[in-house]
């Protein structure tokens, strides 16, 4: 017979780690530049932009495997990983999409992923910058973990938005998007 303590032991361990370890949360705000740019400043060339992908790609692959492992441990299903191309102007090296049975489980997966990665970062000595950018939704939660973007979606949201087809470059989806843009831009018939 299981006692209450043994059934709740993993939860108590997570609570103990969260309470007894120093976890910092960082929130970033973009500040608008103050001041007026003079004409002689605009004639100068902008500074060279360094790429987002200057870190080791094998470390990124290992990190993505850890994130996918954490998602499967949380019972996420249909995990789909998309590697961003070098030509894309995105700070993310990988995008991960997974499904949950309902929106409540999607919220729990997103929150548990964030807390597990923070606890893992504290134990390894490196702070993992994990933040959840979706506060309330109808089953779609987006988390940004270092250079990986994680989408946890309910089945209905995943079927509705079909991000895999858009990111994979499915021509059928891209043609539908172009048709919708044309409908919007055409003047109404009289």
UniProtKB/Swiss-Prot annotation:
<dbReference type="GO" id="GO:0005739">
    <property type="term" value="C:mitochondrion"/>
</dbReference>
<dbReference type="GO" id="GO:0036498">
    <property type="term" value="P:IRE1-mediated unfolded protein response"/>
</dbReference>
<dbReference type="GO" id="GO:0090071">
    <property type="term" value="P:negative regulation of ribosome biogenesis"/>
</dbReference>
<protein>
    <recommendedName>
        <fullName>Uncharacterized protein K12H4.2</fullName>
    </recommendedName>
</protein>
<comment type="similarity">
    <text>Belongs to the Iojap/RsfS family.</text>
</comment>
<dbReference type="GO" id="GO:0017148">
    <property type="term" value="P:negative regulation of translation"/>
</dbReference>
<dbReference type="Pfam" id="PF02410">
    <property type="entry name" value="RsfS"/>
</dbReference>
<dbReference type="InterPro" id="IPR004394">
    <property type="entry name" value="Iojap/RsfS/C7orf30"/>
</dbReference>
<dbReference type="InterPro" id="IPR043519">
    <property type="entry name" value="NT_sf"/>
</dbReference>
<dbReference type="GO" id="GO:0043023">
    <property type="term" value="F:ribosomal large subunit binding"/>
</dbReference>
């Amino acid at each position: 017979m299981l006692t209450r303590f043994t059934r709740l032991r993993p939860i108590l361990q997570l609570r103990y780690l969260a309470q007894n370890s120093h976890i910092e949360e960082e929130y970033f705000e973009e500040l608008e530049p103050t001041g007026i740019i003079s004409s002689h400043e605009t004639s100068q060339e902008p500074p060279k932009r360094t790429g987002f992908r200057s870190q080791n790609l094998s470390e990124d692959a290992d990190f993505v495997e850890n994130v996918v492992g954490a998602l499967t441990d949380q019972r996420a299903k249909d995990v789909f990983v998309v590697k961003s191309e070098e030509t894309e102007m995105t700070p993310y090296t990988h995008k991960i999409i997974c499904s949950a049975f309902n929106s409540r489980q999607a919220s729990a997966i997103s929150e548990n992923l964030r807390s597990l990665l923070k606890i893992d970062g504290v134990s390894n000595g490196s702070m993992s910058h994990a933040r959840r950018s979706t506060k309330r939704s109808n089953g779609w939660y987006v988390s940004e973990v270092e250079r990986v973007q994680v989408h946890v979606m309910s089945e209905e949201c995943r079927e509705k938005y079909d991000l895999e087809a858009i990111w994979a470059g499915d021509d059928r989806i891209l043609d539908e998007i172009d048709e919708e843009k044309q409908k919007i831009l055409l003047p109404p018939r009289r």
